[in-house]
Amino acid sequence: MAGMSLLRRVSVTAVAALSGRSLGTRLGFGGFLTRGFPKAVAPVRHSGGHGKRLFVIKPSRFYDIRFLKLLRFYIALTGIPVVIIITLVNVFIGEAELAEIPEGYIPEHWEYYKHPISRWIARNFYDSPEKIYEKSMAVLQIEAEKAELRLKELEVRRLMRMRGDGPWYYYETIDKELIDHSPKATPDN
């Protein structure tokens, strides 16, 4: 680029010198090819000192900053109300105290927890221990019935092999005399 610019200026100076005009001195040249570079018309200024400032290409931080701002916003959006609710529950309701159980009263499963928030979670989201026990007993009963059926099937297969019986889904073929082989006008006749 610099070479092309220098070549253009030299050619302009050469044309001016050959045409008899003194265009070369007005362009900053002393004469035809007397100097390699033109003089600076105005002083070059680099603002801020420390030489020429460079444009450094670096990745954008827009999405990083936006993500961090949204993260702080949503943490504040959910965290502040949760902190307020927990503080109000601790101040105004407080923890449960251990007391004697009245005669004939059966406590619910959530009443064994000390903190009110733990009680609320146990009451609304967790199953009672009795329900969990019944579900596990139902699973055990189903698995026991499956094991019993597998043993019965093995015993049936053993007896069938021993006695030479066919499978229980075996059907006798129909008698050939019942099949009508006469020509038919339509397939459904």
Swiss-Prot record:
TM spans (from-to): 73-93
Transit peptide: 1-46
InterPro entries hit by this protein: NADH_UbQ_OxRdtase_B5_su
Subunit (UniProt): Complex I is composed of 45 different subunits.
A Pfam entry, by short name: NDUF_B5
Organism per entry: Macaca fascicularis (Crab-eating macaque)
CC annotations in GO: mitochondrial inner membrane; nucleoplasm; respiratory chain complex I
Protein name: NADH dehydrogenase [ubiquinone] 1 beta subcomplex subunit 5, mitochondrial
Topology with respect to the bilayer: Single-pass membrane protein
Localization of this protein: Mitochondrion inner membrane
Main location: mitochondrion
Function: Accessory subunit of the mitochondrial membrane respiratory chain NADH dehydrogenase (Complex I), that is believed not to be involved in catalysis. Complex I functions in the transfer of electrons from NADH to the respiratory chain. The immediate electron acceptor for the enzyme is believed to be ubiquinone.
Family classification: Belongs to the complex I NDUFB5 subunit family.
Keyword Hydrolase attached: no
Keywords assigned: Electron transport, Membrane, Mitochondrion, Mitochondrion inner membrane, Respiratory chain, Transit peptide, Transmembrane, Transmembrane helix, Transport
